[in-house]
Amino acid sequence: MSSKSELESLLNKIVKSNDETEVSKALKEIEDNNEYIEKKQLRSLLTMHDKKFKDQCLIPMNNLYVKYNDIVGKDRNLQNETAFVDRDIRVLESTLQYIIENKNSHNTNHGGCNKTKNSSKDKLLDK
């Protein structure tokens, strides 16, 4: 039993020792270097990369946005106007088709007896 208590006392002496060893000196130096790297170098590196990112990417992209935003807005308006024109053309085509169908059904119902000389309207509708 004395060897066990002797072993425990030696272990406590090593663990609670205030004497610096080569390993403890190296560990302290590593911890100090790590703290310096995290607090000083890493922050300055992040700041440098943030500035580089802003200068090379963000600012040019913002300049492009400012330069071409009005053009895109005009194109958007042009697309809306095109949609309106397309809709109007479809309405006119449908109306013309209904007129032609109505004319054909009217001529069929009356046997075509009321047909007069081809007027300009009839020529347009025949096309």
UniProtKB/Swiss-Prot annotation:
<dbReference type="GO" id="GO:0031083">
    <property type="term" value="C:BLOC-1 complex"/>
</dbReference>
<protein>
    <recommendedName>
        <fullName>Biogenesis of lysosome-related organelles complex 1 subunit BLS1</fullName>
    </recommendedName>
</protein>
<feature type="region of interest" description="Disordered">
    <location>
        <begin position="103"/>
        <end position="127"/>
    </location>
</feature>
<dbReference type="GO" id="GO:0005768">
    <property type="term" value="C:endosome"/>
</dbReference>
<comment type="similarity">
    <text>Belongs to the BLOC1S1 family.</text>
</comment>
<feature type="compositionally biased region" description="Polar residues">
    <location>
        <begin position="105"/>
        <end position="117"/>
    </location>
</feature>
<keyword id="KW-0967">Endosome</keyword>
<keyword id="KW-0813">Transport</keyword>
<comment type="subunit">
    <text>Component of the biogenesis of lysosome-related organelles complex-1 (BLOC-1).</text>
</comment>
<dbReference type="GO" id="GO:0032880">
    <property type="term" value="P:regulation of protein localization"/>
</dbReference>
<comment type="function">
    <text>Component of the biogenesis of lysosome-related organelles complex-1 (BLOC-1), a complex involved in endosomal cargo sorting.</text>
</comment>
<dbReference type="GO" id="GO:0007032">
    <property type="term" value="P:endosome organization"/>
</dbReference>
